[in-house]
Design a protein with these regions (language model features):
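Serine-esterase "nucleophile elbow" of acetyl-processing enzymes
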Residues: 1-65, 70, 75-84
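Structural recognition of the beta-strand scaffold that forms the well-ordered cores
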Residues: 23-25, 58-61, 87-91, 126-130, ...
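A short acidic, helix-capping loop that chelates divalent metal ions and anchors anionic groups
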Residues: 32-34, 70, 96-101, 135-140
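Cell-envelope and extracellular/periplasmic
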Residues: 62-67, 91-102
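Glycine-rich anion/phosphate-binding loops
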Residues: 67-74, 102-112
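Active-site segments of SGNH/GDSL-like serine hydrolases
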Residues: 91, 95, 116-152
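Charged, glycine-enriched surface loops/patches
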Residues: 105-129, 154-164
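Catalytic His-Asp segment of secreted/periplasmic serine-dependent ester chemistry enzymes
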Residues: 133-237
């Protein structure tokens, strides 16, 4: 099965007809605000509103730090289905890979698949995201780092099996991390979380996949993220 393309998302047709959209970001600490300043989901919201106007839709952040797929299933009805989304951007797995959580790769796959099917039952499209290639050398315990690699591959496989869109941050960021660790670490707050520039980069990359850009006066505020994006593009050339 081939993964869904971003151009196929129903929100594009809705926006062209001037219909109101609702987009929900669902996940853990990398979805919830982890530090002050603009967050990757803010850049997504700004990009849509720059193109389609400030009243084009609601952009709801439903991330909770420390969550696993078990937690997302538990709070699904109240904190996702409640919003009746047209699109869900789901980023999960960084806590499932913690050995203390006792979530096996098989359970992670099953839970993620169930989440996708529940979201589809709402009539919503899905963008699955992998994490941003965490700093595996600095993750403790080492077993968590190994599990992280496994779980991110599962995200890719579920995206294909469930025909969702995929934003594969992990694969993109890994090229920089594995080639230039010093530059990669300029985008990280710690081994598991991005800093301001990392947030900019994720948001700008997502906007590009949606076929959108920020207004020129907004782009002037995003020079670090744009430079990081250009650097990563060179590793994909």
């Amino acid at each position: 099965m081939v993964k869904m393309e971003f151009s196929e998302l129903k929100i594009h047709a809705m926006l062209e007809k001037h219909e109101f959209i609702r987009v929900v970001a669902f996940g853990a600490s990398n979805t919830q605000r982890y530090l002050p300043g603009a967050h990757w989901f803010d850049y997504v919201e700004m990009g849509f509103k720059n193109r389609f106007g400030g009243s084009c839709g609601h952009f709801v952040n439903s991330g909770i730090s420390g969550n696993t797929t078990v937690d997302l299933l538990r709070r699904f009805d109240r904190e996702l289905a409640f919003y009746r989304p047209d699109l869900v951007i789901m980023t999960i797995g960084g806590n499932d890979c913690n050995p203390a959580k006792n979530i096996s790769p098989e359970m992670f796959r099953s839970n993620l698949t169930e989440l996708c099917r529940r979201i589809r039952a709402l009539g919503s499209d899905i963008v699955l995201q992998t994490y941003y290639a965490c700093d595996l050398e600095r993750i403790d315990p080492a077993e968590r780092a190994r599990m992280m690699v496994t779980d991110m591959q599962i995200v890719r496989e579920v995206a294909e099996a469930e025909n969702t869109c995929l934003n594969d941050n992990d694969r993109r960021w890994a090229r920089l991390r594995d080639s230039d660790i010093a530059s990669y670490r300029l985008l990280m707050l710690n081994s598991m979380h991005v800093n301001d520039t990392g947030n900019q980069l994720i948001g700008l990359d997502l906007l590009r996949k949606f076929g959108l850009t920020l207004r020129e006066d907004y782009r002037g505020q995003c020079t670090p993220g744009l430079l990081a994006q250009a650097l990563m593009d060179r590793y994909e050339a």
